[in-house]
């Protein structure tokens, strides 16, 4: 059996290279490969109860540390719920 290298692995490795230590998220369908990769590569997953909370937490981490804050959300309403925190991060120049 061969080891599978998925998109989640590539993403998590790239984030680690940037200094990211945690991903804020609400678990959901199409982003499961990110969770598997995060566990494999030793990245901390912080589960929240709402996508906006995950995105605001990521923005706060970016603002306080200078390291990009990361929120992983699923398609549809998950992305829609991150519009306000993404706008705040953009206006504040948060990484």
Language model features with spans:
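N-terminal alpha/beta PP-like core and its mobile active-site loop of ThDP/TPP-dependent enzymes
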Residues: 1-95
